[in-house]
Each structure stands twice: as structure tokens, then as C-alpha cells.
UniProtKB/Swiss-Prot annotation:
Keywords: Aminoacyl-tRNA synthetase, ATP-binding, Cytoplasm, Ligase, Nucleotide-binding, Protein biosynthesis. One of its GO terms (cellular component) is cytoplasm. Its EC number is 6.1.1.21. The keyword Nucleotide-binding applies. It is found in: Cytoplasm. One of its GO terms (biological process) is histidyl-tRNA aminoacylation. Coiled coil: none annotated. Its main location: cytoplasm. This is Histidine--tRNA ligase. SUPFAM superfamilies: Class II aaRS ABD-related, Class II aaRS and biotin synthetases. InterPro entries: aa-tRNA-synth_II, aa-tRNA-synth_II/BPL/LPL, Anticodon-bd, Anticodon-bd_dom_sf, His-tRNA-ligase, HisRS-like_core, HisRS/HisZ, HisRS_anticodon.
Length: 423
């Protein structure tokens, strides 16, 4: 027997057993976004490498260590590590945002060369939202309120909390960076080699260190909120006031900076303690300079992305009462001369008249008992039984697989009305 080829480490399959929960979560996401009037866009998985270097920042961990990059003739290409840069590129290239507000969303796989662990994978999936052309803090609030609504839809609202910060303008961060570096230089003995490298290249990233000794020291470090420019401070104050009035609870986290260089003003994360180390389920913020940085007209931007794998894990962990639809509602079983055509015709009639129902026809033969076992395994609610006598009398036997209702025989003419009452 030949050696079995396995999936790449950190890139996982989604089984028929798992996919209904994924679909349920994705449908919830789509429905909430639709209720706010947002429009779906779809971008390529592969983009030009310089797009991410310019957008995310060359000294970030994502660009310097984690991207899957390859050469195609003389062009360097990268599997997208996140969605914002590609969405901004598409918006500029296709003229979606020229003198125009846009509220866009997307969903799909992203790729980062990280050490795989629970909740962190090399291929992972995100749902992202990007808003263009709106400067006011009201739209920041809408994004946060939208995500809060989604958590309720998923039944996880009691297990996530909102962390909020403002990182101000580029000029304000430059002043803060100088003060932070001056403070941290006295504590290099506590730092790993990686943290010392960050101190030189991207010192704000030290604020979210997992080094407990350094975390303790950072409690006395200068606070970014004390260095904000007046515009950023006013923006943040108005955002917090609106969230307060809308009843959205949050914690101001002065160490929250996010890991990508394009952010300014508002940054936020929804976090959970139910998933261990991988506690961030959604994160985002403003990026008012990114469109111009990538060659477009000056356009304000704000958005977020949520990890679908982490949402799946969180829903499985905390929402034990979830009711995910089965793959099959009705299983059509048949045996005997002339029953195949009748079974197929009956199944097609149901699909035409009741398209919301999932109908499967048994196609692998065998006795009725074997067919019923298959229907049970698939979680079907009803089995429709067609034998030779049913074909001759133009009837069908309806079997409730839960045993709650007695088996009964009804005419094919009455079948659709019967199913409407059941489903």
C-alpha cells in the first residue's frame, strides 16, 4: 500500500460532522452583517508581496516571519495573511471608494507560518469588515455594537469582553515611542532576545508581551493615552460615551496596540478566558492613512476581523444548547420493482415544493432495515418508505425516526401538505 499523503501541519480538514456548526456560525455572521446593510466582496487569496510589506509594516512579525511567499517568474507573491490590505487594494483598484462611503465584508482563508496549537493554525478563516469614507466615531461604535449583537446570536455574549484603547495619530505615537523606549532601556535584563529586537524595531509591540516579569514592569510604564493628540482624544471620548449610552460594557486597556502598523486612533479586541492562550476572538480599529499609503486618495478606514476557528471552539465550549440543523431532514428509502423511479420523483417533488428541506435518496440498495439505520445515522427526522405496494396505490409510508409519532401511510397527493405541517 502506498504511503498516505497527509494534510500540511496546521492546515486542517473540516469533516461532514463539523461542517454544520461552521455553516451555522457563518450564516449567523452573514445575517447580522446583512441586517446592517453591509455588502460582501471577494478578493484573491494570493496578492503581490509588497502590498503586505507596505500595509502591515516590514518590521511586524507577520511580514518578517510568518508569510507564505514564493516567486512566480519575476514576481514575488504571498498567500494573504490577513484581509484588510487586499480589501483596500481592491477598493482602490476598482474605484469602490472614490468620493463614496462603503461598508464591506468578506469571509475566507488566511495563511501564516506560525507554530500550530489550539486556536492558532497556519491556514485559518476570518470574517472581516472594512468601512471606508467615514471619519466620525459613530461608525467605530457601530462596528462594536454589531459584534456585540453577533455574540448574542451565537450564545457567547457572557463569555467575551471588550477591550478598548486609542493609539492616537502617527505623530502622537512617535512621542510616546520615545518615552517608552527610554523607560524600557532600563529593564533589558528582563527581556528575551526577541523582545530586545522589538525594542529596537517596534517597541509598542512589547506592550502585549507574555513575559510576566516584563508585564509587571509595564504597569509603571508611560501610558499611550497620556500622549494622545487632541483630535484622537476627542474621538475616543465620544466613542466611549456612545458605547456607555448603548449599554456596551468595555475595559480601557492602555497596553492594547494590535500587531499591525496601519492602525491609528481606535483599536479594540473582544477576548475570552475560555480558550486559554488564544483568547482574542475579534480585533480591529481605525486605519485612516492606509488607503493613501497604498496609492489611493486620502480616505478614512475602520474595520475588524474575527477568527472563525476560535468562534467554533468557543461556541462548542460554552453554548451547550446550540441546535445545529442536521444534514438531512427527510430520507427516502425504497425497495422492489418499479420503486426507483417513484422514489426519485417523490424526492424531486419535495425539493421543488419545499426547497428549504434537505432531502436525500438512498442509492446503495439493501433491505429497509439497513436503509433506516443510514437515515438514523444522518439524523433525519422522517423516512419516506416506497415499496411495490406503495407504487401500485400511489402512496408513501411516513416513518417518524424518533418514534414520537406512529408510522402512517398517505397518498402522494397529500404528501406536501403533510410535510408543511411537520416542518
Amino acid at each position: 500500500m502506498a504511503n498516505i499523503i497527509k494534510a500540511i501541519r496546521g492546515m486542517n480538514d473540516c469533516s461532514p460532522t463539523d461542517s454544520p456548526l461552521w455553516q451555522w456560525i457563518e450564516d449567523k455572521v452573514r445575517n447580522v452583517l446583512a441586517s446592517y446593510g453591509y455588502s460582501e466582496v471577494r478578493m484573491p487569496i494570493v496578492e503581490s508581496t509588497p502590498l503586505f510589506a507596505r500595509a502591515i509594516g516590514e518590521v511586524t512579525d507577520v511580514v518578517s516571519k510568518e508569510m507564505y511567499t514564493f516567486w512566480d517568474n519575476d514576481e514575488q507573491l504571498t498567500l494573504r495573511p490577513e484581509g484588510t490590505a487586499g480589501c483596500v487594494r481592491a477598493a482602490i483598484e476598482n474605484g469602490w471608494i472614490y468620493n463614496n462611503e462603503q461598508r464591506l465584508w468578506y469571509m475566507g482563508p488566511m495563511f501564516r507560518h506560525e507554530r500550530p496549537q489550539k486556536g492558532r493554525y497556519r491556514q485559518f478563516h476570518q470574517a472581516g469588515v472594512e468601512i471606508f469614507g467615514i471619519a466620525n466615531p459613530e461608525i467605530d461604535a457601530e462596528l462594536i455594537i454589531l459584534t456585540a449583537r453577533l455574540w448574542k446570536e451565537l450564545g457567547i455574549e457572557q463569555h467575551v469582553s471588550l477591550q478598548l484603547n486609542s493609539i492616537g495619530s502617527l505623530a502622537a505615537r512617535a512621542g510616546y515611542r520615545t518615552a517608552l523606549v527610554a523607560f524600557l532601556e532600563n529593564h533589558q535584563a528582563l527581556m528575551s532576545d526577541e523582545e530586545k529586537e522589538r525594542l529596537l524595531k517596534n517597541p509598542l509591540r512589547i506592550l502585549d508581551t507574555k513575559n510576566e516579569a516584563l508585564q509587571e514592569v509595564l504597569n509603571d510604564a508611560p501610558k499611550l493615552l497620556d500622549y494622545l493628540d487632541d483630535e484622537s482624544r476627542q474621538h475616543f471620548t465620544q466613542l466611549c460615551a456612545l458605547l456607555d449610552n448603548m449599554g456596551v460594557q468595555y475595559e480601557i486597556n492602555p497596553k492594547l496596540v494590535r500587531g499591525l502598523d496601519y492602525y491609528n486612533k481606535t483599536v479594540f479586541e473582544w477576548v475570552t478566558s475560555a480558550l486559554g492562550a488564544q483568547g482574542t476572538v475579534c480585533g480591529g480599529g481605525r486605519y485612516d492613512g492606509l488607503v493613501e499609503q497604498l496609492g489611493g486618495h486620502a480616505t478614512q478606514g475602520v474595520g475588524f476581523a474575527m477568527g472563525l476557528e476560535r468562534l467554533v471552539l468557543l461556541v462548542q465550549e460554552v453554548n451547550k444548547n446550540i441546535s445545529v440543523p442536521n444534514a438531512v431532514d427527510i430520507y427516502v428509502v425504497f425497495s422492489g420493482e418499479g420503486t426507483t423511479l417513484a422514489a426519485f420523483q417523490t424526492a424531486e417533488k419535495i425539493r421543488s415544493e419545499l426547497p428549504h428541506l434537505r432531502v436525500m435518496t438512498h442509492c446503495s440498495g439493501g433491505k429497509f432495515q439497513k436503509q433506516f439505520k443510514r437515515a438514523d445515522k444522518l439524523g433525519a427526522k422522517l423516512a419516506l418508505v416506497i415499496g411495490e405496494s406503495e407504487v401500485q396505490t400511489d402512496r408513501v409510508v411516513v416513518k417518524d425516526l424518533s418514534g414520537a409519532v406512529e408510522q402512517q401511510t398517505i397518498s402522494v397527493v397529500e404528501l406536501i401538505d403533510y410535510l408543511k405541517r411537520v416542518f
